[in-house]
Amino acid sequence: MEQTETPSADQLETFPNPRPERDFTIEIVCPEFTSVCPKTGQPDFGTITFRYTPGESCVELKALKLYLQRYRNKGIFYEAVTNQILDDFVAACKPRRCEVTSRWTPRGGITTNVTCVHEA
């Protein structure tokens, strides 16, 4: 099922953190991320990794998957998409800490990794 909506924080669902009194780290790896290079129109393929310490809520994984699929046909640079994903994740989940890293497949012999961090 192809998603055509623009990605936004309200598409991310959450559930209550089962241990809000404890700091713990959740790592989510999404190895099939795609977007479109706004300069060339070619598809970009990458892996998005979330490492976060939840506050009162945790992200629901199916909603996260559907949110990320909405970037499939969106023209956006690596740096912009990584920052936007972090901003939307923080708005939806309100984590104590969150790090989003995008690792992109090589293009022209160059590999790019982008890491964005939020500290509450």
Can you say where each PLM-predicted feature lies in the sequence?
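N-terminal intrinsically disordered, cationic/polar leader segments
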Residues: 1-120
